[in-house]
Amino acid sequence: MGRSSYKRLGDYIQPVDIRNEERKVETLLGVSNAKVFMPSIANTIGTDMSNYKVITKGQFVYIPDTSRRGNKISIALMQEEEAIVSQAYTVFEVADKSELLPDYLMMWFRRPGFDRYARFKSHGSAREIFDWEEMCEVRLPIPDIEEQREIVAQYEAITR
């Protein structure tokens, strides 16, 4: 696939902002620069968890602040059923999974080239931010869904 066939990610993803208003979800997760979720180490004693964001299986979470993260962007794909994350995180999902597989997109996010791109496109002085608008402007090859499935299957066969 040549560069001209790269597509704008923003045409395939949408933001999600569901809050834990009823405080039903208690599992609090963080996102590491290894691109996985981890149990939060934050001291939450006395913290009002109702403003935290609820995430569900198949959704992505990333930390827009790219400062002090080892030149990597912290992003992960949720594999569990439900959890909450900090309100400072950005949550999004693939709008139509018949056009773009979340697992295929996560493969793209794991590439060192994506980390370099995100750092280059981050802006700010004390805190550099890779905001939602920049995420939407990411361009990547999006082959037909069957080819995506094959690519993901090959990747998983190698990495397992």
Tell what function each PLM region has.
Residues 1-20, 137-160:
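Non-catalytic DNA-recognition/assembly elements of restriction-modification systems
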Residues 57, 61-112:
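A short beta-sheet element
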Residues 76, 121-124:
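Short amphipathic beta-strand starts and helix->beta connectors
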Residues 83-88, 123-149:
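A short glycine-rich beta-alpha junction/loop motif
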Residues 114-117:
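Periplasmic-binding protein-like
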